[in-house]
Amino acid sequence: MPFGGLFQLTLESTINKSVANLKLPPHDVTVLRDNLKPVTTLSTITAYLLVSLFVTYFALFKPLTARGRVACFVLKLLTLFVYVPLLVLFGMYLDSFIIFSTLLFRFIHVGYYAYLYKNFSFVLFNVTKLCFVSGKCWYLEQSFYENRFAAIYGGDHYVVLGGETITFVSFDDLYVAIRGSCEKNLQLMRKVDLYNGAVIYIFAEEPVVGIVYSSQLYEDVPSIN
């Protein structure tokens, strides 16, 4: 097995150097290799497990900045069209297959939604679902409970999505559009004004009936006779 590849560990080169330095006879070399075979096998399995884990993490990684997303996209292209051919050139076929197939599958997966919605952001953000507000997109936050509602921080006639301030004129035009593997629109249902002048905009599929403050849960309300 050749030495090299992404996280590829091998004892072959060490064994060959040891055999050459010790000048062992052919019979002893065979015995040594047979004794070390379980170790080399375990090393090979560990190497490819590490390759698979790292490449999967790399394929699913989602940078939080615009510069990071572009850099990650370019790095994936370089990996596919520069690094993988180098691995093939040096005979590391299994490494190259794992890396190429994992990255290509992820590109096809997110690229399908980019083609479907004619929006390259799915590829750059490396996700199959995005939320859009006034044409600006961001990751679908975990706080968007099962895509049923969303709470976005902002102020008077603006919201903050992904660190970017998005202004709007009319409340009628403000809504959250979820696109990708899940498609729905969350309408603005409630505007909560905070003491510091900030605003929390609540978007949902169903109308918001009311908001209960935590202090009200234990409030002693006197009865009226």
Swiss-Prot record:
Q: Does the keyword Transmembrane apply?
A: yes
TM spans, by residue? Answer: 41-61, 70-92, 97-116
Give the matching PROSITE patterns: COV_VIROPORIN_3A_CD (PS51967), COV_VIROPORIN_3A_TM (PS51966)
> Any one cellular component term from GO for this entry?
host cell membrane
Q: How does this protein lie in the membrane?
A: Multi-pass membrane protein
Q: Which UniProt keywords apply?
A: Host membrane, Membrane, Transmembrane, Transmembrane helix
- What InterPro entries does the database record attribute to this sequence? a/bCoV_VIROPORIN_3A-like_CD, a/bCoV_VIROPORIN_3A-like_TM, Coronavirus_Orf3a/b
Location of this chain's protein in the cell = Host membrane
Q: Which residues form the CoV 3a-like viroporin CD domain?
A: 129-208
> Its principal location?
host cell
Q: Where is the CoV 3a-like viroporin TM domain?
A: 35-125
- Domain of life, per UniProt, equals Viruses
Do the record's keywords include Transmembrane?
A: yes
Name of the protein: Non-structural protein 3
